Each structure stands twice: as C-alpha cells, then as structure tokens.
Amino acid sequence: MYAYFRGELISSSRDNAIVDVGGVAYRLLISNSTYRQLPSSGDQVKLLAHLHVKEDLMQLYGFIEEEERQLFLLLLSISGVGPKLALAILSGLPVEEIQEAIMANKPETLFGISGVGKKTAARIILELRDRILKLQQTRPGKTAGAGSVASLSEDALQALMTLGFSRASAQQAVTRALLSAENPGVEDIVREALQNIRNH
C-alpha cells in the first residue's frame, strides 16, 4: 500500500518516527540503525515503508535504506519471526553484520540479540543463506541477466503499473520476485511478481 513517506520529521525516538506528509502525521516503527541516520526534527526525511497487516492490526515500519527493508521482509518470511522480532534483530546489529553472520553460518552472532534463541538463529541461517547470497549478487552495480537489478526492477515496476497495479504493491511484489527468480530478466520478474500479488 505504501512505498515510502517523504515529509517533515516531527519527532523521533529509538523505536519510532513521526513524519508529516501534507498535513497528515504518520507514525512508523523503526530500528536503531534507521534512528541513527535520521535528520533533526523539522528537516525533510524520506522513509521507505512496509505496512504489516495482521487481523485487525495495521502497523507501519520505516527504513532509511532499501537493504534494511529487504532484510526485514526476508526475516518476516521465517516461521516464528514476526515484525517485532525482525525489528529487534535489525536494531541489534547492522545489516551488514547480520548478513555476514548468515553467510558465514555463525548462529552465535544472532542469538546474542535479545529475543533470538539458538533454534531461531539456526532457522534464520538455514532459510536465508541462499536468499541473502542471491540478493547480494543482484545489487545495483552487479549484473543480473541483461542488466543491473536497479534497471530490471524499474522496468518490472513500470510493466506492473501499466497492468493497473499501484507502485506500492508492485514494489513489494518485485522485491520478493528478485529474491526467488533464477537469473532474472524483466519477464521472469514480472511473472514472479504477478504470482506474488495473487498469493497475497
């Protein structure tokens, strides 16, 4: 539903930020990493967003960097890891250290984070190692099929928007598609993204 919020930063703390967008104030839960990168209150800010919906509860999560949002979504895909724990993990360590721990098979790094036990740490590594590797291989500046992931992503976004999907829903579907498509081209990403949209 929401891709990002751009507006005046009204206030922030270690776990949330309030952004005024056109006279409407939005409260987004954030990690320590995002908090440390926020500007001063009164300045303009852009926060990438994820709307988490569960039963009758809707909560917005905000991220300064796309890499952090992608890792948040990956963590949510793991059974037993909800948004609260995913945000705690992102607050416990920088994104790079979390990825390194997963790639190097070091669960002890993760279960040092509050709320992460040995079983959860092992599950995170087991389920995310290959997906993190694929994500790193398809970052901007590296080739993925016929072009960089940034170019592929934008082309796929435009294709989905032409089909009538909002940019926000298309963005989330494309992000998931990039993580699961093998040697993705634009057609592969669009096909996978459409499947993701139908399943959500």
UniProtKB/Swiss-Prot annotation:
Residues 65-143 are annotated as: Domain II. CDD domains: UBA_RuvA_C. It is found in: Cytoplasm. Residues 154-200 are annotated as: Domain III. Keywords: Cytoplasm, DNA damage, DNA recombination, DNA repair, DNA-binding. Residues 1-64 are annotated as: Domain I. The keyword Cell membrane does not apply. Signal peptide: none annotated. Residues 144-154 are annotated as: Flexible linker. Its main location: cytoplasm. GO terms for molecular function: ATP binding; four-way junction DNA binding; four-way junction helicase activity. Homotetramer. Forms an RuvA(8)-RuvB(12)-Holliday junction (HJ) complex. HJ DNA is sandwiched between 2 RuvA tetramers; dsDNA enters through RuvA and exits via RuvB. An RuvB hexamer assembles on each DNA strand where it exits the tetramer. Each RuvB hexamer is contacted by two RuvA subunits (via domain III) on 2 adjacent RuvB subunits; this complex drives branch migration. In the full resolvosome a probable DNA-RuvA(4)-RuvB(12)-RuvC(2) complex forms which resolves the HJ. Belongs to the RuvA family. Has three domains with a flexible linker between the domains II and III and assumes an 'L' shape. Domain III is highly mobile and contacts RuvB. This is Holliday junction branch migration complex subunit RuvA. It comes from Prosthecochloris aestuarii (strain DSM 271 / SK 413). The lineage of its organism: Bacteria, Pseudomonadati, Chlorobiota, Chlorobiia, Chlorobiales.
